[in-house]
């Protein structure tokens, strides 16, 4: 541990959970893409056979044509972009606090030293050949391809226990996505709010152009691949609104089979949708199993107390002296206290209509019962719920009461002070509470996902979310000790989710496989603690609270009741006989009055008191036996917590389908990301560059600020080899000429391409080169100028392919330049180093200058203080936006980490760090749109 708790101050220990028994395949980092074998880099093709024999089935336009062939999914490899260990960040703050207090900071272990856990003799570049430590995963990309890659390349087929799928509720593109980390205000019809992220727009273009028909195709394809990932006992939960719940349920039955349907759960929305008629306040969660006969299910319970709906039928009370009566209205309304020792109960059914069982005279469990001098038989259509021996024990335990013409079972409220949850979850509130703050435009309440995960999984099981959003599924899975993989097409969503996970605080639940857990289990179960050796294996689960569950069956099978009855009969029967003799009566047990008659002789009064005292004691002993023999229900949502410890998220990786998600540059010329695809092919059809030029003329080139836009006064084709357009814009009052270079529709622009285009532009007398491409190879990033000619690299968004779907208004930021970060490396007097982020260098077309934008446009920035050119480890993290992901941790650890250390998390200057052993550091800067740029420094 980084810091041991002080006995005097009661300091908290910061810890985390790891899944030591679980492994994952060794996959490439973005840095290793250049050494991939060709067969590893080449996308595979995965086929899922269609089921053409479905009857009945949901039909939509285009389904027949799709069913003519199998579902074919291209399976690209995944690349690790970042490795994150949140505990390492907290350990660094603890060390800084120690140093500020002039105490010797404890040497903290390097949590990244064995992050992978690869076998020592294994070649780290032999991808997909070795297993390594499990780390949770946050993946950028189309969920269809990502899930197929997990199944085919990484062997996760049949390994996922639970999938929580929250697809768009309908086909309105804008309302489902968020365009910036700084704003949740997304309006349909606002062109400025339409997301411009390539992965999302591709999903939109491919999905919604044919309305509900495309929507159903989108869902069916992903559900098909998702089913392939599930274990035989696995479950999928699909959250959907009332607009499409009927279609989606039919679609799930097509994919999983109607026999795999488990439940349709109704949940209350945070706000009602208005309409002409009734407002919609209900959303739905559809629960389907991979195999209905083997589904893993853990019951969850709600409370059942007097005054609640679940206890509405509990209308009677038995007092401590065994007298019974109805509850008063004030008692039922909780306006009056019950007498001490009183137990609330209801008169429940003691007969059964079991189908297929014989009933009537001579049938099993059909017999007369003598009670209070009467003989009661069940009707000819029913039978008792127990046999004759069981009925005698129920009578002996005072669990049977005579009603007007039959018998009833006495069911106490505390027999089972909980109630199994059903499919109506209207008790789940919204997500604007302090405990569950909203950070994303479409965000699911934590409690909703928590219930689903707890019902269908155990600690250590794997949970997958194909639609990450704000990361709620990952947050819940992390809290409850489940492994998780979350996927999204939005870089904004993943930026928010990453910050949320990095700064989250979780309770530390007692592991069953720990010494503290063994001690707690012994205490709760009232047994001697286990002496078995412990290993901290989370798959053994937690130590849970539990409630007794007394049933009619457990009482009927409790043979100890017979023994207790016989023992007390030896006391009660002589007293009854003496009482009858004194009063010259022949009372049976049930006829003895509760209160004595004042006219009785003193001897009879004492016998009466002794008899009732023994009778009450017998009842208490029988009740104690019933409670001791009762089964228990575990409360899986209430594990015992060790409040001396604080838990942060375990290690996780940030990954993507493409190795070119970030642009990496080295100030000293050394390169971070040597990823490169084959040479870009520029044999694009004339239609593609022509379409790009048309949009470029209308939209211009946007930088971080709205004012910093290159607005072209004219733009025409140019007959060059690489330069294909000539644009004119104003710099002050002077007109300038821009050469337009357009990269391939599919592929990556390399440095050599930019150099050649810049030379061509310089020879032709242009004032600036504007390169437009979907991806830039890492060598290009530090190439910003060739002689006098500035080179601007604009990233094109993939919605340029969808002119028919998104109107070209010129306001969509189709061509965006996220400039190179302006970073200073500082050296302190003690030889340690700091990094200062000044902002982002941007080209101002109005003046022709390159200026620093300042830090306002930066959402967060990370440092790998010992960059080994193999992986980017997030060793320092700083958040410059308005959100504070460490808010809850700051409150919990206010005694362990001082305010000055916390304040460093929001600065533009890093905390000091020693000279890296590798001789290099890497700095990654992320803006509010999710764009990432990385820069490498050689530290002498």
Feature annotation, model-predicted:
Residues 1-325, 371, 396-399, 403-940:
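S-adenosyl-L-methionine-dependent nucleic acid methyltransferase catalytic domains
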Residues 303-416:
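N-terminal auxiliary segments of SAM/dcSAM-dependent transferases
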